[in-house]
Amino acid sequence: MSTSQGRIVQITGAVVDVEFDGTLPDILNALETTNDDKTLTLEVAQHLGENTVRTIAMDATEGLQRGTVVTDTGGPIMVPVGPGTLGRIMSVTGQPIDEAGDVPHTMKAPIHRPAPSFDEQATEAEVLPTGIKVVDLLCPYAKGGKIGLFGGAGVGKTVLIQELINNIAKLFGGYSVFAGVGERTREGNDLYWEMIESGVNKDPKEHDGSTEGSRCALVFGQMNEPPGARARVALSGLAQAEYFRDEEGKDVLFFVDNIFRFTQAGSELSALLGRIPSAVGYQPTLATDMGALQERITSTTKGSITSVQAVYVPADDMTDPAPATTFAHLDATTVLNRAISEKGIYPAVDPLDSTSRILEPRIVGEEHYGTARRVQEILQRYKALQDIIAILGMDELSEEDKLTVARARKVERFLSQPFDVAEIFTGSPGIQVPVADTVKGFKAICDGEYDHLPEAAFYMVGTIEDAVKKAEKLAAEAA
């Protein structure tokens, strides 16, 4: 381990310049100094010449002074990995932030490492059921794939990701890692207690400080933290997921909320590091930064990492460079649409915009594929007719088109579903629907078997049988 020492010569917000007398530390090396009696980690970003390196601080730099001694650790930032991390909340550098003592570990892993080579990658396609109708039918998720949840502010990305954690992590029984990147601290706190209440994690206060039996590790770098922490926290979480995949041969779930904040933090740092910005003010290395993270999230012959990433879409503009760059890496995209949430249909998933690489007959089966395409066809036809309806009214449509519109409105409402995590808002208990029941229900609506039921019966129900019961209840109330 190198113990080369330097001293701070300049501090510009989250960027700190350090001068060394001897050998300069390598790019991406971690340096350590003290600030207010706490260890502050710096990561080398640039060699400036004249024996000076420019570094990024992983915590607040208030109180740092020029001349303070800095030590080179001789390697990248290392974080604790292994079963001891499960049930704990850690910072970007692996420090505990849940007031439950040190994180027990037998080894540490670097947050920077190369992606698995071609010959280590696995390519089988297997569907990962989620219990959410619109997802399972129209944009099914692949086990070991990368999934993106796209949406503007307040359309339900975090609620959907929490429901996926609830549905998949509970049924799944494997290990999960949750990286909270630049999101609200309140949401992180809610998630932590929700996991304890649902039995996914154990409360250390009730088990003498132990979290044994927990199944999810949490790594947080929240909105109020410096850009250095937000730009690296996803990598810290990924290092833990890679340990479970490579060393223990597990299938791991890796949740990131929100991948846009990773890009945003990189953009802030890029300006502080003096790089010339590219389109819309983003860093010129946007695609490289994203690729370095995404290429490591993959399935190998040892185990798999299935990742679910929430992607904030600035001003609902899908062509913005940040979401557009993320699109290229994903196997399935679930697009949340404000117009759908305004109709009160939740989850507000856009059935025509959401896609999946594995929605093909060879993988999901002929019946599922055919039903999904028919549903999209009906909704597309309804969308095309909306201008005519707005100008001339429903009466001007042909009988066939009237039938299409009626079925489309039923399909639209049947795509809604009550969520477990939203029960406190809606008062309705959450429902998970098996894939076979989802396909059966939508096929029956497309075939016209339920043309006689009112469209209100299809809103916020689980299976098609629930819709029939709701229709009977509505009829009884109206009588």
Swiss-Prot record:
Pfam families: ATP-synt_ab (PF00006), ATP-synt_ab_N (PF02874), ATP-synt_VA_C (PF22919). It is an enzyme of class 7 (translocase). GO terms for cellular component: plasma membrane; proton-transporting ATP synthase complex. It catalyses: ATP + H2O + 4 H(+)(in) = ADP + phosphate + 5 H(+)(out). The keyword Nucleotide-binding applies. It is found in: Cell inner membrane. Its EC number is 7.1.2.2. It is a peripheral membrane protein. Belongs to the ATPase alpha/beta chains family. Produces ATP from ADP in the presence of a proton gradient across the membrane. The catalytic sites are hosted primarily by the beta subunits. NCBIfam families: atpD. This is ATP synthase subunit beta. It comes from Maricaulis maris (strain MCS10) (Caulobacter maris).
